Protein backbone atom coordinates (compact mmCIF):
# COMPACT_ATOMS: atom_id res chain seq x y z
CA UNK A 1 0.00 0.00 0.00
CA UNK A 2 1.20 3.48 -0.84
CA UNK A 3 -1.29 5.92 0.72
CA UNK A 4 -1.50 9.50 -0.44
CA UNK A 5 -2.95 12.08 1.92
CA UNK A 6 -3.09 15.43 0.19
CA UNK A 7 -3.70 15.53 -3.55
CA UNK A 8 -3.49 19.33 -3.50
CA UNK A 9 -5.09 21.74 -5.91
CA UNK A 10 -3.91 20.18 -9.13
CA UNK A 11 -4.02 22.82 -11.83
CA UNK A 12 -7.15 24.53 -10.45
CA UNK A 13 -5.08 27.56 -9.46
CA UNK A 14 -2.93 27.81 -12.56
CA UNK A 15 -0.39 25.97 -14.69
CA UNK A 16 2.52 26.40 -12.27
CA UNK A 17 0.82 24.14 -9.72
CA UNK A 18 -0.31 20.56 -9.98
CA UNK A 19 3.09 18.87 -10.02
CA UNK A 20 2.18 16.08 -7.59
CA UNK A 21 2.18 13.34 -10.24
CA UNK A 22 5.58 14.51 -11.50
CA UNK A 23 6.90 14.34 -7.94
CA UNK A 24 5.43 10.87 -7.37
CA UNK A 25 7.11 9.65 -10.55
CA UNK A 26 10.40 11.35 -9.60
CA UNK A 27 10.28 9.36 -6.36
CA UNK A 28 10.04 6.14 -8.37
CA UNK A 29 6.30 5.49 -8.02
CA UNK A 30 3.33 5.66 -10.35
CA UNK A 31 -0.10 7.20 -9.62
CA UNK A 32 -1.61 3.74 -10.22
CA UNK A 33 0.25 2.47 -7.13
CA UNK A 34 -1.63 4.82 -4.81
CA UNK A 35 -4.46 2.82 -3.27
CA UNK A 36 -5.65 5.05 -0.41
CA UNK A 37 -6.25 8.81 -0.39
CA UNK A 38 -7.36 10.36 2.87
CA UNK A 39 -9.10 13.71 2.49
CA UNK A 40 -9.05 16.11 5.44
CA UNK A 41 -11.72 18.30 3.82
CA UNK A 42 -13.08 19.05 0.37
CA UNK A 43 -11.89 22.57 -0.33
CA UNK A 44 -10.54 22.79 -3.90
CA UNK A 45 -6.95 23.28 -2.76
CA UNK A 46 -7.15 19.87 -1.06
CA UNK A 47 -9.03 17.81 -3.67
CA UNK A 48 -8.31 19.45 -7.03
CA UNK A 49 -5.37 17.15 -7.67
CA UNK A 50 -7.60 14.07 -7.72
CA UNK A 51 -8.56 14.66 -11.35
CA UNK A 52 -7.00 15.80 -14.61
CA UNK A 53 -9.22 16.55 -17.58
CA UNK A 54 -12.16 15.01 -15.70
CA UNK A 55 -10.36 11.68 -15.19
CA UNK A 56 -9.09 10.03 -12.02
CA UNK A 57 -5.40 10.74 -11.49
CA UNK A 58 -5.24 7.80 -9.05
CA UNK A 59 -7.43 5.16 -10.73
CA UNK A 60 -6.73 2.42 -8.19
CA UNK A 61 -7.22 4.56 -5.09
CA UNK A 62 -10.05 4.52 -2.63
CA UNK A 63 -10.74 8.13 -1.64
CA UNK A 64 -11.97 8.56 1.93
CA UNK A 65 -13.56 11.58 3.59
CA UNK A 66 -16.01 12.30 6.38
CA UNK A 67 -19.69 11.53 5.73
CA UNK A 68 -20.71 15.10 6.64
CA UNK A 69 -18.04 16.51 4.35
CA UNK A 70 -19.28 14.55 1.36
CA UNK A 71 -22.91 15.19 2.19
CA UNK A 72 -22.30 18.93 2.30
CA UNK A 73 -19.89 19.60 -0.59
CA UNK A 74 -21.24 17.00 -3.01
CA UNK A 75 -24.88 18.10 -2.65
CA UNK A 76 -26.48 19.77 -5.68
CA UNK A 77 -29.08 21.32 -3.36
CA UNK A 78 -26.32 22.93 -1.29
CA UNK A 79 -24.61 24.21 -4.45
CA UNK A 80 -27.90 25.69 -5.67
CA UNK A 81 -28.44 27.47 -2.32
CA UNK A 82 -24.84 28.64 -1.88
CA UNK A 83 -23.95 32.31 -2.21
CA UNK A 84 -22.19 33.18 -5.48
CA UNK A 85 -18.78 33.50 -3.80
CA UNK A 86 -19.02 29.93 -2.42
CA UNK A 87 -20.26 28.13 -5.54
CA UNK A 88 -16.72 27.52 -6.81
CA UNK A 89 -15.93 25.52 -3.65
CA UNK A 90 -18.88 23.20 -4.32
CA UNK A 91 -18.13 22.93 -8.04
CA UNK A 92 -14.47 22.14 -7.34
CA UNK A 93 -15.35 19.39 -4.87
CA UNK A 94 -17.98 17.91 -7.17
CA UNK A 95 -15.70 17.89 -10.22
CA UNK A 96 -12.81 16.41 -8.23
CA UNK A 97 -14.77 13.63 -6.52
CA UNK A 98 -17.34 12.71 -9.20
CA UNK A 99 -15.11 10.25 -11.11
CA UNK A 100 -14.31 8.42 -7.86
CA UNK A 101 -17.95 8.40 -6.72
CA UNK A 102 -19.08 7.13 -10.14
CA UNK A 103 -16.44 4.38 -10.05
CA UNK A 104 -17.43 3.30 -6.52
CA UNK A 105 -14.02 4.42 -5.23
CA UNK A 106 -15.29 7.01 -2.71
CA UNK A 107 -15.83 5.76 0.85
CA UNK A 108 -17.38 7.88 3.57
CA UNK A 109 -15.99 7.86 7.11
CA UNK A 110 -18.72 8.07 9.73
CA UNK A 111 -16.78 7.63 12.97
CA UNK A 112 -13.33 7.86 14.47
CA UNK A 113 -12.02 4.53 13.23
CA UNK A 114 -8.98 2.69 11.99
CA UNK A 115 -9.20 2.83 8.19
CA UNK A 116 -6.28 0.58 7.41
CA UNK A 117 -3.84 -0.96 9.88
CA UNK A 118 -2.01 1.85 11.67
CA UNK A 119 -4.05 4.76 10.26
CA UNK A 120 -6.98 6.18 12.22
CA UNK A 121 -9.42 8.92 11.20
CA UNK A 122 -10.15 11.51 13.90
CA UNK A 123 -12.92 14.13 13.68
CA UNK A 124 -11.69 17.73 13.93
CA UNK A 125 -14.78 19.56 12.70
CA UNK A 126 -14.73 23.33 12.59
CA UNK A 127 -12.80 24.40 9.53
CA UNK A 128 -15.45 22.48 7.60
CA UNK A 129 -18.43 20.38 8.65
CA UNK A 130 -16.51 17.14 8.26
CA UNK A 131 -12.84 18.08 8.69
CA UNK A 132 -10.70 15.12 9.80
CA UNK A 133 -7.15 14.48 10.89
CA UNK A 134 -5.41 11.16 10.36
CA UNK A 135 -3.21 9.57 13.01
CA UNK A 136 -0.52 7.21 11.77
CA UNK A 137 0.97 4.86 14.40
CA UNK A 138 3.82 2.44 13.92
CA UNK A 139 6.43 0.92 16.22
CA UNK A 140 5.45 3.17 19.13
CA UNK A 141 5.67 6.34 17.04
CA UNK A 142 2.73 8.61 16.19
CA UNK A 143 2.32 11.11 13.36
CA UNK A 144 -0.75 13.36 13.08
CA UNK A 145 -1.61 14.46 9.54
CA UNK A 146 -3.85 17.50 9.35
CA UNK A 147 -5.30 19.77 6.71
CA UNK A 148 -6.36 23.30 7.58
CA UNK A 149 -6.47 22.84 11.32
CA UNK A 150 -3.85 25.59 11.67
CA UNK A 151 -3.54 28.50 9.24
CA UNK A 152 -1.10 30.99 10.76
CA UNK A 153 1.30 29.10 13.02
CA UNK A 154 2.92 32.20 14.54
CA UNK A 155 -0.50 33.39 15.71
CA UNK A 156 -2.44 30.19 16.38
CA UNK A 157 0.21 28.25 18.30
CA UNK A 158 0.37 31.18 20.71
CA UNK A 159 -3.43 31.57 20.77
CA UNK A 160 -5.33 28.49 19.50
CA UNK A 161 -8.64 30.33 19.91
CA UNK A 162 -7.88 32.40 16.79
CA UNK A 163 -9.86 31.25 13.76
CA UNK A 164 -10.12 32.45 10.18
CA UNK A 165 -12.88 33.51 7.83
CA UNK A 166 -12.88 30.13 6.06
CA UNK A 167 -13.67 28.18 9.25
CA UNK A 168 -17.34 27.23 8.82
CA UNK A 169 -17.91 26.73 12.56
CA UNK A 170 -15.74 29.19 14.46
CA UNK A 171 -16.60 27.70 17.87
CA UNK A 172 -15.75 24.12 16.84
CA UNK A 173 -12.58 25.33 15.09
CA UNK A 174 -11.38 26.82 18.39
CA UNK A 175 -11.62 23.50 20.21
CA UNK A 176 -10.69 20.94 17.52
CA UNK A 177 -7.89 18.79 18.93
CA UNK A 178 -4.89 18.03 16.73
CA UNK A 179 -5.06 14.30 17.54
Question: Language model features by range: what are they?
Answer:
Residues 1-3, 48, 56, 96, ...:
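Catalytic core of the metallo-beta-lactamase
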Residues 2-3, 42-44, 69-72, 151:
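Solvent-exposed loop/turn segments at secondary-structure junctions
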Residues 11-22, 129-179:
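Cap/insert and terminal regions of metallo-dependent hydrolase folds
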